[in-house]
Structures are given as structure tokens and as C-alpha cells.
């Protein structure tokens, strides 16, 4: 399973916000009688921010140049810093741009402090100051710099509260405050004990969610950012996986050139739904989109796709295809994502081990160790050493090799030639549901329905069960066998099980649904 990129981005920020409140906040002066409300030239700035979210960084820079002048310079500087953060966020393991980024952001924050001091009655001055601190909190949180994040968390809360006190209709400010309210309430128990010990103000989960939703629906600048953070909340704490995936789909529809929404959707299917078939489909969409020119940051997108696909294919009993995906990365020797070659060599070793090619697998593990980048943020070295120290069971790997050989022969249209290697695979590992399913498909193609039915039934009885797509496909094929024998009741039962099976491939689910519609 690939480790989710960017996962936990706001967990350390949550801790930071709670710790920040330990310091006594300065007493806010009452707002002036004539506060200055609104965001100057908001449509121009929103256009630039939309380009950032669509990963069009050059376009965003050009749009900011047009917007600045009519729009406040500080607003443009904050959005420019956010764009630079997104560039880093795309490849978080790479720290080479950190120093330049923090220097730029510190300058932006200092300018924001001066603006708020000059015009304390202007809501947008406080808003952009809080937004600048928000960018830096994300950076500190990702780098596990908790004390620095805590200091900035306090400043975000103060700045956004000040902005809302001056302009209650400034919905964008609800994004930052909503995150504070939510995480202060749902924080892990250790943080709640700390909050009680220090006398920190508590949060309100319901209010926090409402503020995040308000910002995601009515915000001008931070609408997309609020939606992105809300999808993380839904994944991590609310257990609204489907809603989170739908939010990513909506973001991808709005910003179709940004590959990160596809990446995050693939990871959500993989990690939170254990739906490797759906994850694989999206990883391949990344590859195809990068090659076809529909995605920006094409190198990153394609490598994310190949690496993710390799992991899924090994888990889905197709290690030969997994090896091909890993080799596609190795052949490119990409500069990004950070450590991609080491990860690809590791996945190649795992795929080759599954196929029984131990010597080649050992070479791949050693190549992974040689390619591990500074800091080894993905812990690839440890995984490669484990691969070197563990020799797979030879009977298992031989059965897998034969099963793949037979299945690829069948895919080429040679059912008769596929049968012998699959027979041998089942003989070696009779309780492997993958081998049973594959032999069942060959028997069905050869009109031997009795043997096919026995294999599909056995694939559903073995423990552990085969990967989910094989379970769903076995139900579907049994439905076809029962339908052919005019057993409508059992056919409906099997088709229904196939359509409902968790982790079924999109093709199997569609075929089962069509069969149900036909029989009903």
C-alpha cells in the first residue's frame, strides 16, 4: 500500500492551534465605528487563485501581475506565496526549495503586519495577514515544526477573528476559524488533557464543520481551499469516505489540470476503502492524462500513476504488469517525485519476488538501496532490506508464475493453451482463489460449465479470500452459469452479490447491474 501523500497535513496544525491558545492572546480593541469591509478587486484575485488550484503557476503569476495595482500588493504577495507552497506541496519529500520559500513568506508576513498596523480598521488587512500565517502553518505542520506552527496558529486565530469582527460577511475567514473550532473539539485525548491543564478554550465540532462548509460554499478566495480541507476532515474523522471522494471529484471537475485531486482520490480508494480496482483505474488515469497533455506537472503525475499502479497490480495478483509499471519509472530516472527511482526499484523487487525471479528481485532491492535519497522520507531502505532478508515460498511463486502464464495465454485467445499451466497452478496451490477463478474462466470458455462452477464456488470458499475483484467476478460468472441453466433465482442472487461486492471492478459491477436489469 502506498503511503498517502500529504496525509496528516492538518493533524500537527491541529496540535499547533491548541498549543497556541496557551499563550494569553492580546486584548482586541473594539472595532472602529466605520470599518472598511470587503476584499478589493476580489474577482481578479479569485481568478489568480483559481489558476493556482488548477496548477497553472505561470498563468497565476501573469494574472497576479495584471491584478496588482488595482488589488492590494499584499493580497498578490500572499497568493504568490500560496502558489509557491503548492509547488512544494506537490513533492513534499523534496526540501530543496524550503529556504527560499520561508524567506519569501517571512517577508510577506512582515509586510502584512505593517499593513494591519497602518490600517487596523481594514478587514482585508487582517484577513491577508491571517492567510499568510495560514500558509506558513501548513509548511511548519508538514515539517513537524510544532512550536513554530503553534506561534503562527495563534496569529491566524487572532487575525481572522479581527477580520470577521470588522466584516462579518467575510466568509473566507471562516476557513481558518472553522479548522480551529473543529480540531479543538475532535483532537486526540492527549491534546484534550493538555487543553484542560492549560485552561485553553475548547472547540465546537459542529460549528467548525458549519464554518468550513460556509467557506467552501460562499468564500471568494478560499472556497476551494476550504473544500480541500473539508475532504480531509471527512476522511480522517467524520468517516464520510464517499463524501470526501465526491468532493475530490468536484475539485477535479473544477480544476481538471491539477493532478493532485486524482492522486488523492486514488489514495482514498486504496487506503480508506481498500478498493484497489478503483485506485488502479485512477492511477492509470494519471498516467494517461500526463501523456495525453490534459494534466499539468506531467512528470509528477505520470510517476505518481506508475508507482501507484505498481503497488495495486501486485496486490491484485498481476505482478508481471506491476513490474512493467515500475520499469517505466526506472527507465525515466525522473527528478520528481523525490526518491521515485528507489520506490520503483522496491516495487520491482516485490513484483519479481512474486513471480519467483529471486535473483532479479535481489538485484532490484539492492538497486533500491543504492537509489535511496537523502533522509529516506519513505523508509524505502528498510523495506528493501526486508525484501533482501525474506525469501518467498517457492511453491507459491511457481504457482503464481504458472497462473500468470496461463492467464496471459487466455487473454490472447488461446483457451486450450492456457489450461495446462493453470491446471498446474491449481495443483500446487488448490486453495488459492485467484488460480481457481482463472481456471474457471478457461473452463467456461471451453464449455466445461461443471468444472467452471466448481472453481468459482471454491474461489468464494477459500480463506483468505482472493482480492475483491476476483470475488465479485466469481459471483458474476456463477450468475451467468445459473442463468444459462434457467435457474433465475440463483442467477439473480449471484448477480446481486457481484453488483454489491466491495472492491468489484467497474466492468464487473456494470455487467452485473445490466444482468439484474435484464432478469428483473
What feature does the model see in each segment?
Residues 51, 84, 91, 133, ...:
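Residue at a conserved register position within TPR or TPR-like alpha-solenoid repeats
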Residues 226-236, 270, 303, 307-315, ...:
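Alpha-helical adaptor scaffolds
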Residues 26-47, 51-64, 70, 80-169, ...:
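Short coil/linker segments at helix-helix boundaries
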Residues 87-99, 138-139, 184-192, 237-242, ...:
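Alpha-helical linker/edge segments of TPR/alpha-solenoid repeat scaffolds
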Residues 46, 79, 86, 128, ...:
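"A position-specific structural signal for the A-helix of alpha-solenoid helical repeats
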Residues 157, 200-210, 284-288, 353, ...:
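TPR/TPR-like (Sel1-like) alpha-helical repeat modules
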Residues 68-69, 110, 158, 210, ...:
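Amphipathic alpha-helical segments of tetratricopeptide repeats
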